[in-house]
Each structure stands twice: as structure tokens, then as C-alpha cells.
């Protein structure tokens, strides 16, 4: 399968590496523009962009997705079968999602529809959830509302923190994405793929809003367990 990979942070890298080392072909990568991350205001590329450059994969760093005709033209030239999206950082519009032959697919780090949105790992920890997981869903214009192809549940251990859980879910995302791509490669027609509507899963719909600055401060009156997390 010819794939355009969309991702930005370190979290995306494991999936990118696994797909790039598989029988499938990454024909292009889309990531966030370089950002100022040091005192000298030096522009630093994303981890995904660094990987693209070091592996000689065409990379695009658009400032915007909507109404970006130049980007649409370049993406269509790649003649891709799939878009694979994991922690890209922006919402893709319908015109973009419909470019690849067999759709756009996202690896989301929660058991949807619980924790739709930008910070599912953090919200699961803060809410005291006992389990979480990764779902591979077919993307649509809604916020993480697409039908699910496959998912896997994992336990959140008592001693789990953001770093350890992020690593686990990053590895799980890579594993499930390859499995999903192989399924789609065999079917070659999304109408034949067995997808599950999120609303049939009997789970509460919750939204994982971005973590605010105030939430980063420790409350010394809190429990030792919560402070550790």
C-alpha cells in the first residue's frame, strides 16, 4: 500500500518507523512546521520531519490545511492508497480526507468514544481510569467520531504515569496500525471492511480537552498517588 503519513511529535515516530520498515511504502509525510523551542528562537523541526529527511522521504510542513490548494495538488500527485494519521496536531478537512483511494485512518489513544480530542492519555490518568487503549478509526470531519476498524484495551497500572503510559500506547498504536493496513490491503474496498460505530460500544462520550497551564501545578494537599502521576 502507498501511504502518506501524518504525524508530528515523538509519539508518532514508533508508528512511522514500523510502517516504513514494512512491505508498505511511505510516499510522503505531512508534519507541523518548524517551531521556536529554545532561548535563541532557533527553529526546530519536529521529530517526524527529522525522520523524513534522514530517510529521504518527501515531507510537507503546511501552515494550514483548509483552503490550501497547493497542498491538495501535491498530495494528489502522490497517488496514495491510505492516509495514516497519528498525533498530527490539526484537524483534517473533508476534501483532504477523501484524497487517498481507501480513505484516511487515525490511531487514537483511547477507547472511543471516551476521550475524544487532543489529550486522551492525560485525561485518562487524571480521571483515574483503570484501563485505556488504542483504536484505529476511519476518519471523518467530526472530532474523533469515525467508525472503528480494530482496537485493543490495556490496563492502567497503579504506578502508571504519563511517560510510561505514553510509551505503551505509542507501541500499541504501531502494532495496530500495521494490522489495520494489512487488513485494508487484503480488502482493497472499505465497503467490505467490518467497521463498528462508536455509539454501539456502550461507552460514555467524554472529551479530552487540552491540558491547561493551571493543571500542571502540583496540589500539595492531593494524594501521593495523584502527585506522582
Say what each PLM segment does.
Residues 1-229:
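One-carbon transfer enzymes
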Amino acid at each position: 500500500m502507498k501511504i502518506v503519513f501524518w504525524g508530528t511529535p515523538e509519539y508518532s515516530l514508533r508508528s512511522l518507523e514500523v510502517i516504513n520498515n514494512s512491505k508498505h511504502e511511505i510516499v510522503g509525510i505531512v508534519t507541523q512546521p518548524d517551531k521556536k523551542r529554545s532561548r535563541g528562537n532557533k527553529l526546530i523541526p519536529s521529530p517526524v520531519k527529522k525522520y523524513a529527511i534522514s530517510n529521504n522521504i518527501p515531507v510537507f510542513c503546511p501552515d494550514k490545511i483548509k483552503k490550501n490548494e497547493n497542498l491538495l495538488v501535491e498530495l494528489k500527485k502522490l497517488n496514495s492508497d491510505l492516509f495514516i494519521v497519528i498525533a498530527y496536531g490539526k484537524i483534517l478537512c473533508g476534501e483532504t480526507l477523501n484524497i487517498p483511494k481507501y480513505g484516511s485512518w487515525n490511531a487514537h489513544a483511547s477507547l472511543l468514544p471516551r476521550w475524544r480530542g487532543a489529550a486522551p492519555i492525560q485525561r485518562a490518568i487524571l480521571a483515574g481510569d483503570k484501563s485505556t487503549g488504542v483504536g484505529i478509526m476511519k476518519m471523518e470531519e467530526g472530532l474523533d467520531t469515525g467508525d472503528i476498524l480494530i482496537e485493543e484495551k490495556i490496563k492502567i497500572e497503579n504506578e502508571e504515569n504519563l511517560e510510561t503510559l505514553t510509551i505503551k500506547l505509542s507501541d500499541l498504536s504501531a502494532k495496530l496500525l500495521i494490522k489495520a493496513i494489512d487488513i485494508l490491503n487484503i480488502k482493497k474496498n472499505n465497503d467490505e471492511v467490518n467497521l463498528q460505530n462508536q455509539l454501539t460500544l456502550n461507552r460514555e462520550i467524554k472529551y479530552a480537552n487540552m491540558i491547561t497551564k493551571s493543571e500542571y501545578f502540583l496540589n500539595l494537599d492531593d494524594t501521593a498517588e495523584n502527585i506522582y502521576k
